[in-house]
Amino acid sequence: MANSFPLRVLPTIDPSAGHTFITPSKRIHESEDVSEFLISKAYVDIMTFLLQLNRAMIPVKLADGTVQSWPINTDAVEFSAPVRQLQQLLTKLEELLAEAPPDTGPRRFGNISFRRWYELVESRASELLGECLPSELLQAKSSDPNSVTAEAELKAYFLGSWGSPQRLDYGTGHELSFLAFLAGIWKLNGFPKTTPGVEERAIVLGVIQPYLELVRTIIKRYTLEPAGSHGVWGLDDHSFIPYILGSAQLAPAISETDPTPEEGSLPGAPSPNGVTKAHIVERERLTNMYFSAIGFIYDVKKGPFWEHSPMLYDISGIQAGWGKINKGMIKMYNAEVLSKFPVVQHFPFGSLFSWDRDPNAVPPPTSAHMSTTQSQSRGPAVPSAGQTPPSGTRAPWATATQAAPPAGAGTAAPWAAKRDGCTPGKPPTSLPDTSRLPPGPMAPTRAPWAASSTGQAPGGDPTHVPTKAPWAK
């Protein structure tokens, strides 16, 4: 066994070496630009930071043979001064909600009072950041005396983290912006250097989880629409990161020399199919980020879980454990968030997240993930050798072990397995053998809707074909 696992860590900027800050600007103007993004330094830095946080949330084997896990509100994670300052920032943003009460008039989409709240945040952004972040970090000077300070870059990602005041929506692109805001602070040496995993866990539990909770409050208060969503065919209307970090919390424990687990679960962890049971969700949402996100779905959606969240329902049938779910979620984030034009088109690029090509990057294959829809001139993506194309809206790496809902109980998910011994659609036999570490772009998973066949609802009328998404082939 190797002495240590080769863990990539997001590099920090050496202030003495000179650095020129740049006001972030839009570089992704059309779907073809996504291919350039996937070989950029910005992409590598984002994935490096996310994987760094992900590994930190996996339970740890201690020297005495016990296991330390990292639930929400654990006493085992201490918050550094920068983390507490960021918590103060989130508190101030929450307090601003009182100054923008929801409009009581008729509306079709979103509450226009969200624009008022966002205007308050935008007008006070420099003041808020100045109160909650060190001045030496914000006012870090460029080597070019005519250039901007670090604040200009951080503020762009900070303001991009709360939704769109024009469209009255919030989605994974805004969540990505907050991840970049934190990664930018990391690159500027804004977090203390500690034992690997220590500060990362504080960032996740002390900042990211409170951020997600604040965002959920904002979404409910102003009835924000999903941004860049695939609707019922997507994973979640608004978020993705809690499913990555929450599945990591439930993965099997590792030592510092172990690779990131790709299957198995922490002993005593709830079964993945617990997401379909409201009482389990209510219990687990208090300690786990995955179930916390599921709990929000229960808060805002009605009806059978398999009907309004078919992909999460599909994933709940995986029997290989939370380690496999975690691996799949990372691959899916790459494919469904970072490789999707509608999601990343608004992400701005400066010096902290550079549009320059990473020298070690390998150009990604052309993929339907990089555009809003699949090209009309070509069929679905061809699966890897040895794999059977997934059917319907299945997560590409899920297995057909989840029981189907009762026949006749509303519109069935087209990919759900039939009961009474009927053979479900054959799932993919294996996951592509891809590294979980950058620098090259991760091999994107197939779009879940890319299968050419249309499934029939279990127990339904064979002449009835489920309604397809408008962008499905």
UniProtKB/Swiss-Prot annotation:
It is found in: Cytoplasm; Nucleus. Residues 395-416 have a biased composition (Low complexity). GO terms for cellular component: cytoplasm; nucleus; protein phosphatase type 2A complex. Its EC number is 5.2.1.8. Residues 360-473 are annotated as: Disordered. Signal peptide: none annotated. It is an enzyme of class 5 (isomerase). Belongs to the PTPA-type PPIase family. It comes from Aspergillus fumigatus (strain ATCC MYA-4609 / CBS 101355 / FGSC A1100 / Af293). It holds the Pfam family PTPA. The gene is rrd1. Keywords: Cytoplasm, Isomerase, Nucleus, Rotamase. It catalyses: [protein]-peptidylproline (omega=180) = [protein]-peptidylproline (omega=0). GO terms for biological process: mitotic spindle organization. This is Serine/threonine-protein phosphatase 2A activator 1. GO terms for molecular function: peptidyl-prolyl cis-trans isomerase activity; protein tyrosine phosphatase activator activity. Residues 368-378 have a biased composition (Polar residues). InterPro entries: Phstyr_phstse_ac (IPR004327), PTPA_C_lid (IPR043170), PTPA_sf (IPR037218). It comes from the Eukaryota. PPIases accelerate the folding of proteins. It catalyzes the cis-trans isomerization of proline imidic peptide bonds in oligopeptides. Acts as a regulatory subunit for PP2A-like phosphatases modulating their activity or substrate specificity, probably by inducing a conformational change in the catalytic subunit, a direct target of the PPIase. Can reactivate inactive phosphatase PP2A-phosphatase methylesterase complexes (PP2Ai) in presence of ATP and Mg(2+) by dissociating the inactive form from the complex. Coiled coil: none annotated.
